[in-house]
From Swiss-Prot:
Organism this protein belongs to: Microcebus murinus (Gray mouse lemur)
A Pfam short name: Cytochrom_B_C
Gene: MT-CYB
Gene3D superfamilies: Cytochrome Bc1 Complex, Chain C
Physiological role: Component of the ubiquinol-cytochrome c reductase complex (complex III or cytochrome b-c1 complex) that is part of the mitochondrial respiratory chain. The b-c1 complex mediates electron transfer from ubiquinol to cytochrome c. Contributes to the generation of a proton gradient across the mitochondrial membrane that is then used for ATP synthesis.
Organism taxonomic ancestry: Eukaryota, Metazoa, Chordata, Craniata, Vertebrata
Alphabetical UniProt keywords: Electron transport, Heme, Iron, Membrane, Metal-binding, Mitochondrion, Mitochondrion inner membrane, Respiratory chain, Transmembrane, Transmembrane helix, Transport, Ubiquinone
Residues annotated as binding a ubiquinone: H201
Primary residence: mitochondrion
Effect of F234L: In strain: Isolate Jorg 64
Cofactor binding remark: Binds 2 heme b groups non-covalently.
UniProt protein name: Cytochrome b
């Protein structure tokens, strides 16, 4: 008799996706991040659901309701900190996942890559709106500054900003709609993840050598299920250490002050995972130019497949490209650091140099180096 998991319409889909899926025999731990991101999403949806049971999306009570969750709700503090730090782990895994894709040439699977970029934008939008909900000083001013950027759009900018605000400033209407969007978007992300996996399973995974692996596949279960469980264990241990020992390490102290439209914090800055983009935004003196650079800093990922000049897919055997890749990584770390610094000398100059280097590396330097490596293959 055939196993039910191979015949039942629903279980058959699960089986072909997570059990009998033929996977390359040599994928390394860098391929763990997909499952870790799935785990992060599940953690965020579950903790978020429990937070939403006690949260009130109203300017007068939002801050108090978050305090109430931490003080009065059973295990409320751990749910709140799991959700806040879970977002940090989510973005850490996202950046490593995208970096893996760039290093090993996974962007040649263009459909999967493009859905991934849409996912990245959606997750960033969700995280931004979630940061506004506690209605602390940084929540309010972050919302004001970031939504205000849309006013740089010619002709319709101001109308667009007021439409998003639901009034003439960030107020009750803004908070209510942000909560509504923050609640619904994770389910949109869930749907996009399914599309992401659908496209991935059309072609099969890439591998560290960047070569076809049809001739040497192994079943996903038990080999990669156990490997993913090991990665998940590391993720959960890291998350729990963060939550239980220093839950506010990655947060901003200003957000423990209730939102006050009459008092601007000395340094308005987003959470750490947006700092690199924020630094690029600030490095351009022109408002519209800054907004375009901000959007392009992520959207540039979409043109990476077109900039592929190398004859080898992966960077495994391309030492010069490897050096450029790690310079790009260092550059992003510098931008992250600069995004959290005040707008003064020498940080402004460092930010401008790092921003120019970021775009130059992706658009000019890395494709040129790849061409040079193609020549080296003939020597």
């Amino acid at each position: 008799m055939t196993n039910i998991r191979k015949t039942h319409p629903l279980m058959k889909i699960m089986n072909n996706s997570f059990i009998d899926l033929p996977a390359p025999s040599n994928i390394s731990s860098w391929w763990n991040f997909g499952s870790l991101l799935g785990a992060c999403l599940v953690i965020q949806i579950i903790t978020g659901l429990f937070l939403a049971m006690h949260y009130t999306a109203d300017t007068t009570t939002a801050f108090s309701s978050v305090t109430h969750i931490c003080r009065d709700v059973n295990q409320g503090w751990i749910i709140r900190y799991l959700h806040a730090n879970g977002a940090s782990m989510f973005f850490l895994c996202l950046f490593l996942h995208v970096g893996r894709g760039m290093y090993y040439g996974s962007f040649t699977l263009t459909e999967t890559w493009n859905i991934g970029i849409i996912l990245l934008f959606t997750v960033m939008a969700t995280a931004f709106m979630g940061y506004v909900l506690p209605w602390g000083q940084m929540s309010f001013w972050g919302a004001t500054v970031i939504t205000n950027l849309l006013s740089a759009i010619p002709y319709m900018g101001t109308d667009l900003v007021e439409w998003i605000w639901g009034g003439f400033s960030v107020d009750k209407a803004t908070l209510t709609r942000f909560f509504a969007f923050h609640f619904i978007l994770p389910f949109v992300i869930l749907a996009l993840v399914m599309v992401h996996l659908l496209f991935l399973h059309e072609t099969g995974s890439n591998n560290p050598l960047g070569i076809p692996s049809e001739s040497d596949k192994i079943p996903f279960h038990p080999y990669y299920t156990i490997k993913d469980l090991l990665g998940l264990m590391f993720l959960l241990i890291t998350l729990m250490i963060l939550v239980l020992f220093s839950p506010d390490l990655l947060g901003d102290p200003d957000n423990y002050m209730p939102a006050n439209p009459l008092s601007t914090p000395p340094h308005i800055k987003p959470e750490w995972y947006f700092l690199f983009a924020y630094a690029i935004l600030r490095s351009i003196p022109n408002k519209l130019g800054g907004v375009l650079a901000l959007v392009m800093s992520i959207l540039i990922l979409a043109i990476i497949p077109m900039l592929q000049t190398a004859k080898q897919r992966s960077m495994t055997f391309r030492p010069l490209s490897q050096i450029m890749f790690w310079i790009l990584t260092a550059d992003l770390l510098i931008l992250t650091w600069i995004g959290g610094q005040p707008v003064e000398h020498p940080f402004v100059t460092i930010g401008q140099v790092a921003s120019i280097l970021y775009f130059s590396l992706i658009l000019i330097i890395m494709p040129t180096v790849s061409l040079f490596e193609n020549k080296m293959l003939k020597w």
